[in-house]
Regions:
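Hydrophobic or amphipathic alpha-helical targeting/insertion segments
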Residues: 114-140, 152-153
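Glycine-rich, proline-tolerant flexible connector loops at the mouths of alpha/beta enzymes
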Residues: 74-100, 104, 108-111, 136-146, ...
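Catalytic domains of carbohydrate-active enzymes, especially glycoside hydrolases
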Residues: 61-81
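Active-site-adjacent beta->alpha loops and helix N-cap segments on the catalytic face
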Residues: 27, 34, 58, 82-95, ...
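N-terminal small/glycine-rich loop or linker at the start of catalytic domains
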Residues: 29-55, 133-147, 172-180
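N-terminal amphipathic alpha-helix/helix-capping segment at the start of soluble metabolic enzymes
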Residues: 2-47
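Acidic (Asp/Glu)-rich catalytic clusters
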Residues: 92-101, 119-130, 163-174
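Helix-rich catalytic cores of soluble enzyme domains
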Residues: 140-188
């Protein structure tokens, strides 16, 4: 797979000085120094199941999207399309109307459940580049009470969902897909 590189941002990263390194001679990674700005990513447009009492409608999301682009963000999480029709419609709008600049990568969030993953791939179809951000609950309480699974069972949910994502890449051949995974944990 060919994963897209992020276009450098015009954000004023020169204003921030580098950290003072801590020397740990028994390790190699702490001695590495960042010489380039990290990827800047916005998650301001995701309402999904974390929506406020009054979630953003499409015109508000579009105004915010345009502002984030103008500010120089190159990765923008534009929604949780399988969690809300508003988010799905917004993602489709910015794709169908060609509102995503060539150097901006959209990101969408999805839970590790087959119908939600499939709906998410429907949402990003036709975009030039997209990041599918997959997550599943790994906390002790949901693992036991909601799923009735042990750690291996929860791990299988994640790996099966990741495999499904890989399989669905072929359904969006015009889109360069990247992946992100997050374990969701509230109670340990």
């Amino acid at each position: 797979m060919n994963f897209p590189e992020q276009t450098p941002s015009k954000m004023p990263v020169h204003r921030y000085s580098s950290f003072i390194p801590v020397e740990l001679t028994d390790r190699t990674w702490p001695d590495k120094k960042m010489t380039a700005a990290p990827k800047w990513s916005s998650v301001d447009l995701r309402d999904g199941n974390q929506a406020l009492i009054d979630p953003m409608d499409t015109p508000r999301k579009l105004a915010m999207f345009k502002l984030l682009v103008a500010m120089g963000y190159k990765e923008i999480e534009v929604g949780f399309p399988s969690a809300s029709q508003t988010d799905f419609d917004f993602v489709r709008k910015i794709i169908d109307e060609g509102l995503i600049p060539d150097d901006v990568i959209i990101q969408v969030l999805t839970q590790a459940r087959e119908p939600l993953i499939r709906r998410t791939f429907e949402a990003v179809k036709g975009s030039k580049q997209a990041i599918i951000h997959l997550y599943n609950s790994t906390s002790t309480l949901p693992r036991r009470v909601v799923f009735g699974l042990d750690k291996e069972g929860i791990k299988k949910i994640a790996t099966d969902a990741a495999q499904l994502c890989l399989d669905l890449v072929s359904t969006v051949p015009e889109t360069k897909i990247s992946f992100e995974y997050s374990p969701e944990s509230y109670t340990g």
